[in-house]
């Protein structure tokens, strides 16, 4: 096995090991999420994406080269199998065909597991997020149920208290209503008396005003008569003199 195919085989074994580790049931997705959240992965994210695409391209090239080798030695294997002149050449070709087929499987499975590994990491990350959201939603639902039960219990207590004190409250309300009605009647009576007194006072004021006007007229008349009498007396005195 050449150096390049030894590296591809080692890469394939590493992929298989990583996939088996990711599939271990006792390691939860949240643990993998914490590992994937390390700052180291954020720093090498750009390099990682470029390396991922580069490895895919290399594996595709090796896979196509292996396909070419398989097709090449398959045709040669068929020709030399029918020929009996060189038996060693047939075995040599068969060995090369076996190696090319081995390289085809190694490169093909390496490419396949590389894509599966990338997809598996993505699914584990998504599953960890969904489980975290599920835990948060479960906690919120439990808190909501507890709050609802608490409110229902308080509501039942209030209903029982209202039922026990309902009769007393009705009696108190009736007494208050009766008192309000009596106060209303008293206010109406006082208002009526006040209105009558106000009307009477207005009438008295009008009468006093009329009397004052009559007295003013009589006073004016008396003043006029008094002045006339004085004039007469003055004339009589002048005649006597």
UniProtKB/Swiss-Prot annotation:
GO biological processes: apoptotic process; endoplasmic reticulum to Golgi vesicle-mediated transport; intracellular protein transport; osteoblast differentiation; protein localization to endoplasmic reticulum exit site
Gene3D superfamilies: 1.20.5.110
Cytoplasmic-side segments: 28-43, 125-241
Key words, A-Z: Apoptosis, Coiled coil, Endoplasmic reticulum, ER-Golgi transport, Membrane, Protein transport, Transmembrane, Transmembrane helix, Transport
Membrane topology note: Multi-pass membrane protein
Coiled coil: 166-233
Transmembrane intervals: 7-27, 44-64, 104-124
Residue span of region Disordered: 198-223
Sequence motif Di-lysine motif, location on chain: 238-241
Domain of life per record: Eukaryota
Compositionally biased region (Basic and acidic residues): 206-223
Pfam families hit by this protein: Bap31 (PF05529), Bap31_Bap29_C (PF18035)
Annotated localization: Endoplasmic reticulum membrane
GO cellular component terms given for this protein: endoplasmic reticulum membrane; membrane
InterPro entries per UniProt: BAP29/BAP31, BAP29/BAP31_N, Bap31/Bap29_C
Lumenal topology ranges: 1-6, 65-103
Subunit details: Homodimer. Heterodimer with BCAP31. Binds CASP8 (isoform 9) as a complex containing BCAP31, BCAP29, BCL2 and/or BCL2L1. Interacts with VAMP3, VAMP1 and membrane IgD immunoglobulins. May interact with ACTG1 and non-muscle myosin II.
Annotated function: May play a role in anterograde transport of membrane proteins from the endoplasmic reticulum to the Golgi. May be involved in CASP8-mediated apoptosis.
Family: Belongs to the BCAP29/BCAP31 family.
Record protein name field: B-cell receptor-associated protein 29
